[in-house]
């Protein structure tokens, strides 16, 4: 029995070690460079976050297939609709100049109030003039409110509030209507 337990422990430890080694193994290369996420061709990752309001994810990171030539605005609208989340666009979804004005937010629809993480509040309160000028934050509260439709939209809670995206943690110099989706990227709103 002791031998069986030792053998089982050894196999368990070995399998854990081998699985962690594969996580650090060299990523697969593809035609555009490095495929660090090991996603299938024609797929990418998209998520919508509301961490700054203390609400976590609106849409968890999701691997999705995209259509060749599809823009981030088109993909976002399609994925949000598939997840029963509203997507309010400024302009047509296929317009290069379009951008996302609002996204349906279940936390907001459920009546949640902002619960900004303490480390952010500490910074806001340490620099009140900057916070008011750049974020629309006044000590003791926000100068904006939500309009009650369950959609987190631009200018709500802050005069400068709005949806921005990053591609692999890099802000791109074009709007979502002009950003073409490509393989192996993570798009975060």
Question: Residue ranges of each PLM-predicted region?
Answer:
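Ubiquitin-like/PB1-type beta-grasp interaction modules and other compact soluble beta-rich domains
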Residues: 15, 19, 24-189
